[in-house]
From Swiss-Prot:
It comes from Caenorhabditis briggsae. Disulfide bonds: none annotated. GO terms for molecular function: selenium binding. Belongs to the selenium-binding protein family. InterPro entries: Se-bd. Transmembrane segments: none annotated. This is Putative selenium-binding protein. Keywords: Selenium. SUPFAM superfamilies: 3-carboxy-cis,cis-mucoante lactonizing enzyme.
Amino acid sequence: MGVCISHEYSKPTAQETEIQQQFSNFSKVDERPPMAVEHQMYDYRQAYEEQDDELFAIICCPHSIGFDRDKIALIDLDPTSDTYCTIISEIRLTSNGDEPGRMNWAKSAESLIEMDKLIRKNIIVPCMNSGKIYVIGFDKNKFYMEKSKNIFKLQEIRSDELFRKDVSCPYAVRSLPLKGAPVHVSTMGDRYGHGKGDFVLIDRKTWEIRKKSDPTFSSFGGDFSLQPRHNLLISSEWGHPRLFRDGFQPSELENVSESFGSCLHVWQISPPKLLQSIGLDSFDGSLVISVKFLHNTDCNHAFAISAIGSSIFHLHMNTLSREWQADRVAHVPSLKVENWVSDEMPALLTDMIISMDDRWLYVCGFLHGIVWRFDIQDPFRVSLHGKINLGGVFDSSPEVRIKTSNAMEDRWWLPPETRSLPRGTKFRGGPALMQLSKDGSRLYVCNSFYKAWDGQFYPELISDGGQMVRVDIVDNEMRLNKKFLVDMKDQPNGPFVIRDIKFLDGDCTSDSFL
């Protein structure tokens, strides 16, 4: 996909010039190669030994049917608490059908050891369907709508403010650990719902949108990741919002579709500038849904996954030419099936998590119902290390069968397993989004990604609501915790689904280290 030019831009302000100077100072500190094969990783056990385990989590809960408002909720994760696995605080968004995307804190820690010291007061919630961006305050385990200068006005960035800048469908949020730096929010469409990859910059003092000093945008937008030490941003491509909001067509699951992007874009953060666009294979890279840098700031390596292409890519830079390239290091093959919407079923990779020590990569297959664990200590030679079954189409719809006789011998595949969860329930849908504890011992998994996709493949998610489960990493094996379950089926005014998970003191996805 190509890159286009916008018409609305302005010269850098004095504050933006100061931020650019901060970046230039950091870029001169260290000119070492980006990474050795045996790279130095965070000793998370030493940094984390005096910290409590995560006791609370903020989760995003869209209303599954849409006749009531979505909400953001605080969940008790303390096993010794009387309110374990229940909502102890919540706040409703202001309108129906917002459909929140990937929320995040407005502040980022500079390093792992600074995470527990950082005071996080505001969480940014972008909404894919309504186009709004909410600023929600959080203090003493309570939510409140952040006020603007007019104390009577609830703080939300309305969709018409984005339309005036010809952007829509805000999706992901990242923050820089620099004083005065804005919050970055990726957008995936123009005002008409056509594909357009751009960014909205939000001032952390006024919560107003800053003017862009660079007019460039990409054909499609999606997820993105920041590497402040190297002044880099990498963004991915989804597709046209007006099309993916209606779910998938059967042909799009088997063939290359122009509805979805297959590129990764490397940007300079400040001053903003597109450095390179990386075209992936049109099918293997179809719908690049997530991209993440390693946590180690000395390493500017990253990983990306594609949903329909069901592939994992390793991104790295040639130190001589300074050119980036993306190598496909793993591919989950589609399964030939019958009695389903298509003759082939991709894994539909929807999320990935890199452990804080940069040793492990977790990837979830929404349709196959499997979470895979990869060893990425050598990012050029990624190896599959473990897997666990959590629902999936074959568990949800027994009439769907696999045609290939050797599927059970496939190293990627696990036969569907109906697991008995607390309160006599089973895991509905498939693994969609994840969060990992900082010590890498607990993987939290929820089963909603986007309601149009949820309802298409798993109608029971819409009728019965979402869930969150916990997978414990014990002796390098993934084991489902039978005592943990958050179930939204019987919530008042529900049902709700569960999407996105954030810990109060930061997690493996919240911060962009410097």
